[in-house]
């Protein structure tokens, strides 16, 4: 799974334009975060990575693609802190983090790091 980090201009309608272009192609956005402080961007996870890349290229958007690592955490206090500490103790920097699905006893999460292969090894993936 991958995330798409798309550069935007910080003005009204930018998110709507990108989200509409993706949705018009039948692509579902599974997770998304947008920022508009110093530079505007939207980072999204979709159900069709190839089609998403094509839409963004066809729009002439600047974007980067990062590998997402999927794992499941217990839905209990401290679970996220435990995982983050395990990675931090090994010098791994978490770049992005998504809660993809929450259930009573578990949380499916996705993250990007500066060392995906080592992250997978540490998390037993």
What are these regions (language model features)?
Residues 1-125:
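A conserved regulatory-domain signal marking ACT and ACT-like small-molecule sensing domains
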């Amino acid at each position: 799974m991958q995330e798409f980090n798309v550069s935007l201009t910080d003005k009204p309608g930018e998110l709507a334009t990108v989200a509409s272009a993706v949705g018009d192609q039948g692509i579902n956005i599974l997770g998304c975060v947008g920022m508009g402080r110093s530079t505007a961007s939207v980072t999204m996870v979709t159900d069709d990575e190839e089609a998403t890349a094509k839409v963004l290229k066809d729009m002439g958007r600047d974007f980067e693609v990062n590998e997402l690592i999927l794992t499941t955490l217990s839905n209990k206090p401290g679970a996220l802190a435990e995982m983050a500490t395990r990675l931090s103790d090994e010098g791994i920097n978490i770049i992005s983090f998504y809660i993809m699905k929450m259930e009573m006893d578990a949380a499916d999460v996705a993250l990007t790091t500066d060392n995906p292969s080592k992250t997978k090894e540490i998390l037993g993936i």
